[in-house]
């Protein structure tokens, strides 16, 4: 659970050969949940760091819980699976498995958090109106 208001800067899934999907989800203090990022075609030999654009970096209030969920494919249909007949547990070797997400965060003061939320709300309102201030159709 986040102790302070937070801006999520990036998300880098890390799994090994059987890794398939990884998702990071926020559970807000009011109970609402939201998927922040989901990588559906994880490639174990191409670990990508997904850096959020400034206007899209998730802003999370204090008390938010982050949940990382990972899916692995240990079937014979997975071309990256060295041996689908083997039970696989956690381990550091590439032929073992693991799942964790590397993320960077910036902790914000409550005032900075509220100001950034207000700035983004103003940007959204401006984008939803046309050049003359009338709504786009």
Where on the chain are the PLM-derived regions?
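Disulfide-stabilized, aromatic/cysteine-rich ligand-recognition loop
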Residues: 133
């Amino acid at each position: 659970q986040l102790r302070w208001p937070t801006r999520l800067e990036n998300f880098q899934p890390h799994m090994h050969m059987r890794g398939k999907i990884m998702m990071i989800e926020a559970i807000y203090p009011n109970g609402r949940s939201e998927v922040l990022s989901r990588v559906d075609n994880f490639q174990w030999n191409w670990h990508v760091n997904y850096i959020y654009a400034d206007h899209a970096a998730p802003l999370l209030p204090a008390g938010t819980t982050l949940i990382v969920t990972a899916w692995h494919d240990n079937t014979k249909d997975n071309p990256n699976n060295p041996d689908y007949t083997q039970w696989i547990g956690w381990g550091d070797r590439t032929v073992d498995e693991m799942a964790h997400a590397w993320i960077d965060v910036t902790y914000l003061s409550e005032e900075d958090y509220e100001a950034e939320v207000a700035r983004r709300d103003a940007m959204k309102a401006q984008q939803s109106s046309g050049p003359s201030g009338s709504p786009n159709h």
